[in-house]
């Protein structure tokens, strides 16, 4: 929630600025404006979190200069985990080193892991009024990427600032980790954090005031307000520019036989990989981000209402495919660690690994591939294919027109309209409760049980089947690419002299599933998918390590 006290949030005045809740603009009471010179700062809040509402200034009348902007992205901890799962190589023939164990040294003295650079790139560091994707030519975009990267790697002020940002991000990581240990879905932990971290990050990057920790905008929120680099075709342009720059640095490192320059190439590539990973977040795949800002008056209202489509696609996910023929269901921001996103996790980690491998290969060979041959691009969700085979998008392009789903509350409504207006659409969306898409699977209501006499081994084995440990199980329903959330966990079974149990797994009696995914959790660890079984199986023997 906002850092404003209740009475402040109702209406604050300071130097001809009035801070008020956006919903008050549409109430009978309205918002009192004392003079022609007053400016109104609206905080869009209500039951939604301000993480997706970035307040700014607008004149009192609707229709001009709305600056309540969405921040739409994978969360920082998610980006960190993706990057730090990568293997980095420095010596030909030697095995890769887990990225979380490697410090990448930057010119300004910062030493960061690959995942930390992925997390900081684009969201926290960049040039707010110079999106990479808006460069007119590949050379222009490469130059813009370099300037964005240098704001982290070269500017002296970034050395201390980045450490403060990462310290706050650790709260997010800790909350997600605790949710995993508790057997909860991590998106619940992100939701519970609300805006508290955004407020801290805004202040760290030069924003905030006595009236609101979110206003004025620091660099963090300015980047969020102009974030086309993180969406669809524009994220693709940003990644290609950054990967190109990193490959050029790797070739230079080869020429000089300088491992320190290879470190810099890896850091540049990690910054670029931020935009690569965004393309695996469902809320970033088909949202017409720039077009909405262009056709809605005021343009910033168009940016604001993209939040609703972003949230829909992130929550329910999209069926996606890539050039290699892989098909999977991808979810979005805050759901990377959720049990239902396991297939997407595999795909995004593989893409980032391919991206990093290409840096080392260019370091060894002294030559760089052309953009048409970048290996990670073959793994990306096909942006055009994702426009079909999914529930009806809230907004969709038809030529140069942005069409809106006719019934905003019905995700299965295929009818679209072109005579919609920004403000009236916002009023429909701000409290809407969309239904569930066709094919949605409800979670099971029962848990697996362990057969009392079904233990398969009396021999302990590393790393988890050990006396003093404990294990429990849950399962989800599946049907093609669709999967439900997991149902309740069984009680922990203490391990002493018996290991590797036989499970009774409840069958589906009405959800329309064709199979089930079985999950296991050792005490203190995170849930893991251990098996997929058909709809008729009633038992499973856990012989997994």
Please give the residue ranges for each predicted region.
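N-terminal, motif-rich segments that launch catalysis or mediate targeting to/interaction with membranes
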Residues: 3-30, 34-46, 53-267, 285-438
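Short, surface-exposed beta-strand-loop junctions and turns on beta-sheet-rich folds
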Residues: 48-49, 525
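Disordered, low-complexity "stalk" and linker segments at domain junctions of extracellular
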Residues: 437-545
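Hydrophobic beta-strand residues in large extracellular and virion-surface proteins
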Residues: 33, 42, 50, 501-503, ...
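Short, solvent-exposed secondary-structure capping/transition elements
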Residues: 154, 278-286, 527
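Active-site alpha-helical segments that house and flank conserved acidic catalytic motifs
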Residues: 265-282
């Amino acid at each position: 929630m906002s850092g404003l006290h209740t009475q402040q949030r109702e209406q604050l005045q300071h130097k001809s600025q009035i801070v008020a809740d956006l919903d008050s603009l549409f109430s009978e009471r309205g918002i009192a404006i004392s003079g022609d010179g007053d400016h109104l700062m609206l905080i869009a809040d209500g039951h939604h979190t301000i993480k997706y509402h970035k307040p700014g200034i607008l004149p009192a009348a609707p229709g001009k200069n709305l600056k309540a902007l969405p921040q739409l992205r994978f969360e920082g901890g998610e980006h960190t985990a993706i990057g730090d799962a990568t293997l980095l190589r420095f010596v030909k023939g030697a095995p890769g080193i887990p990225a979380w164990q490697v410090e990448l040294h930057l010119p300004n003295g910062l030493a960061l892991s690959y995942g930390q650079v992925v997390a900081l790139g684009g969201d926290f560091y960049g040039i707010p009024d110079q999106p990479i994707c808006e460069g007119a030519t590949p050379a222009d975009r490469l130059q813009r990427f370099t300037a964005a990267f240098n704001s982290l790697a070269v500017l002296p002020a970034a050395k201390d600032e980045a450490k403060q940002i990462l310290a706050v991000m650790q709260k997010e990581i800790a909350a997600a980790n605790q949710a995993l240990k508790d057997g909860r879905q991590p998106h619940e932990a992100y939701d519970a954090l609300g805006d508290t971290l955004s407020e801290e990050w805004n202040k760290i990057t030069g924003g905030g005031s006595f009236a609101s920790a979110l206003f004025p905008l620091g660099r963090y929120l300015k980047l969020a307000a102009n974030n086309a680099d993180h969406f669809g075709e524009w994220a693709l342009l940003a990644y290609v520019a950054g990967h190109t720059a990193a490959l050029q640095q790797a070739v230079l490192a080869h020429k000089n036989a300088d491992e320190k320059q290879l470190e810099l190439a890896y850091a540049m590539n990690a910054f670029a990989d931020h935009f690569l990973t965004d393309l695996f977040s469902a809320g970033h795949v088909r949202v017409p981000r720039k077009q909405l800002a262009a056709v809605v008056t005021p343009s910033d209202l168009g940016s604001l209402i993209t939040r609703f489509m972003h949230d829909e696609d992130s929550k329910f996910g999209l069926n996606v495919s890539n050039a290699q023929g892989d098909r999977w269901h991808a979810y979005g921001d805050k759901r990377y660690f959720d049990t239902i996103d396991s297939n997407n996790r595999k795909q995004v980690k593989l893409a980032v690994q391919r991206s990093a491998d290409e840096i080392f290969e260019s370091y060894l060979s002294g030559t760089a591939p052309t953009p048409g041959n970048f290996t990670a691009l073959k793994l990306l969700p096909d942006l055009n294919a994702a426009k079909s085979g999914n529930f009806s998008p809230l907004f969709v392009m038809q030529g140069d027109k942005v069409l809106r789903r006719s019934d905003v509350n019905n995700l299965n409504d295929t009818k679209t309209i072109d005579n919609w207006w920004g403000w009236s659409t916002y009023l429909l969306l701000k409290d809407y409760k969309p239904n569930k898409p066709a094919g949605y699977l409800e979670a099971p209501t029962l848990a697996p049980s362990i057969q009392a006499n079904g233990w398969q081994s009396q021999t302990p084995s590393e790393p988890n089947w050990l006396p003093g440990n404990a294990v429990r199980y849950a399962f989800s329903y599946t049907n093609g690419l669709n999967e439900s959330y997991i149902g309740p966990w069984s009680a922990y079974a203490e391990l002493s002299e018996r290991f590797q149990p036989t499970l009774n797994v409840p069958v589906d009696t009405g959800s329309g599933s064709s199979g089930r995914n079985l999950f296991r959790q050792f005490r203190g660890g995170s849930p893991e998918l251990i098996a997929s079984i058909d709809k008729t199986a009633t038992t499973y023997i856990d012989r997994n390590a």
